[in-house]
């Protein structure tokens, strides 16, 4: 495990790097450093840890992020963690160098040669928590003197009690910490005395948390996968709260999520209390969480509930994306909810499927998919299937439409090509789909005989590039592009990277991708 000194320095916010002048010449009081091409690389070199935002002034999501990013910068400044920003409309080459494809893009830098994307919630507490974890060693060494302080560094802290000579167990724990350091703060000690004080003996793992029973002791075998499952389960409250900071965690948990929609904090507190015993009984099988229906009521439509009719309850299978809405004419009683949840888990209750009507004819160049035909068309094992997931209000989708039709014609008009490749599209706001869609348009290729490994398209949206993508990634290697058969192709129809976060939320449909007047917030 790393030395104690590195942890103490990080806790104290002491800088190990030389002091540098602010990279921007602005005279405002912002704690976010505005970087340009000629200052970016020096700034990254001179700081151990930097979170950089690549943005565009016209981007609506960037504007929403700005105050949260500023709060996080101020909070992290005392810990010598720097937050910076780059305007990609002015520094296009720099943004291209770092693979920026959408706005905002956030990347964590540890020097110029080590950077990775930040994919967490775009809220100050989430950014702050994440960056503090990044500033510490993957496993922080604790002693009797700093133990209480380390336990309170984050909402969840995992501490291992392992003897120094137990090399194999130390190796397993360190590898686990490396793989989960983005989500959880890990610490460790070899002190048998400290272990005894905490009621355990070497080797042991204890998870400390700010909620429920405050701590959980792991009692299984010291194996990575079992430990990982324990940490994921124990770090989730019995009845939590769905919001921007927690949503992605629930979605990646690998088990269903039961939503409890209610308008007031008092109602949500009462429901959390009512269903706590059920949540405890089913822990590890399903997560329970309340959700503020005044702030996030639009999300109810994604679960096939009627928006604005609250309180409400629904279950979402986070793996298959199947939805199970509870009858909104009924009250949320312990008895009825228990029966409903157990029925869903047992497979006795069928999922609700939102689908447009199946088209009477489907003879156009692009095959139209609805939820009821998704399996039949996309999962056809004999064909390479390219699918555009779109939203009717999406400007980039509208711009792509004529080119996508021309692309479809290249295959549809050739009998041999048509037998091997399908070019298709689905309105992801009007149909339940099993795929996780983060922005519009999203284009994926489902190769023949390899449907569980779809390939997402991230290139420029020209007919030639799309056709070549199908050729290069499809099983049949169909080379359909013929410039004589298409109108002037031109360049990428977007003209600029897409505003990357436009999740499929029907009732949130904005008038444009850059600006949206929405009654509800986004998760």
Swiss-Prot record:
Its EC number is 5.3.4.1. Residues 24-137, 344-475 form the Thioredoxin domain. It comes from the Eukaryota. The keyword Isomerase applies. It is an enzyme of class 5 (isomerase). GO terms for molecular function: protein disulfide isomerase activity. GO terms for cellular component: endoplasmic reticulum lumen. It catalyses: Catalyzes the rearrangement of -S-S- bonds in proteins. It is found in: Endoplasmic reticulum lumen. Keywords: Allergen, Disulfide bond, Endoplasmic reticulum, Glycoprotein, Isomerase, Redox-active center, Repeat, Signal. NCBIfam families: ER_PDI_fam, pdi_dom. PANTHER family: PROTEIN DISULFIDE ISOMERASE, PROTEIN DISULFIDE-ISOMERASE A3. This is Protein disulfide-isomerase.
């Amino acid at each position: 495990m790393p030395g104690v000194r590195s942890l103490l320095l990080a806790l104290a916010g002491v800088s190990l790097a030389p002091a540098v002048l602010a990279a921007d010449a602005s005279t405002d009081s912002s704690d976010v450093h505005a970087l340009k091409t000629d200052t970016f690389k020096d700034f990254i070199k001179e700081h151990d840890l930097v979170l950089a935002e690549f943005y565009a002034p016209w981007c609506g999501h960037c504007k929403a992020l700005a105050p949260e990013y500023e709060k996080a910068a101020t909070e992290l400044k005392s810990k010598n963690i720097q937050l910076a920003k780059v305007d990609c409309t002015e520094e296009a080459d720099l943004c291209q160098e770092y693979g920026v494809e959408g706005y905002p893009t956030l990347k964590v830098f540890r020097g110029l040669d080590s950077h990775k994307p930040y994919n967490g919630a775009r809220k100050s507490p989430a950014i702050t928590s994440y960056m503090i974890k990044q500033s510490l060693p993957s496993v922080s060494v604790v002693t009797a003197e700093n133990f209480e302080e380390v336990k309170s560094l984050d909402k969840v802290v995992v501490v291992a009690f392992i003897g120094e000579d137990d090399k194999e167990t130390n190796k397993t724990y360190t590898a686990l910490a490396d793989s989960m350091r983005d989500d959880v703060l890990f610490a460790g000690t070899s002190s048998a005395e400290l272990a005894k004080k905490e009621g355990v003996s070497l080797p042991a793992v204890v998870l400390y948390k700010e909620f429920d029973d405050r701590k959980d002791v792991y009692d299984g075998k010291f194996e990575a996968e079992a430990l990982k499952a324990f940490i994921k389960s124990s770090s989730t409250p019995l009845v939590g709260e769905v919001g921007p900071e927690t949503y992605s965690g629930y979605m990646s948990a690998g088990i269903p999520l039961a939503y409890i929609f209610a308008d007031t904090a008092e109602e949500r507190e009462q429901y959390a209390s009512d269903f706590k015993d059920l949540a405890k009984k089913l822990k590890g099988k399903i997560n329970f969480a309340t959700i503020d229906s005044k702030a996030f009521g639009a999300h109810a439509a994604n679960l096939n509930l009627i928006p604005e009719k609250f309180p409400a309850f629904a279950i979402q299978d986070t793996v298959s994306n199947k939805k199970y809405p509870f009858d909104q004419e009924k009250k949320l009683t312990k008895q009825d909810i228990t029966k409903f949840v157990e029925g869903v888990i047992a497979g006795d209750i069928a999922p609700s499927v939102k689908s447009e009507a199946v088209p009477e004819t489907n003879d156009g160049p692009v095959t139209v998919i609805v939820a009821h035909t998704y399996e039949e068309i996309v999962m056809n094992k004999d064909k390479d299937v390219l699918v555009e997931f779109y939203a009717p209000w999406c400007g980039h989708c509208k711009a792509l439409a004529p080119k996508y039709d021309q692309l479809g014609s290249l295959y549809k008009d050739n009998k041999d090509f048509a037998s091997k490749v399908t070019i298709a599209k689905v309105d992801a706001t009007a149909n339940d789909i099993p795929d996780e869609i983060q922005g519009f348009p999203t284009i994926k290729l489902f190769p023949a005989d390899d449907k569980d490994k779809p390939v997402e398209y991230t290139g420029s949206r020209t007919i030639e590039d799309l056709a070549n993508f199908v050729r290069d990634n499809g099983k049949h290697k169909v080379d359909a592009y013929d410039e004589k058969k298409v109108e002037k192709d031109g360049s990428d129809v977007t003209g600029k990277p897409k505003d990357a976060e436009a999740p499929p939320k029907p009732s949130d449909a904005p008038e444009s991708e850059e600006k949206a007047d929405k009654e509800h917030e986004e998760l």
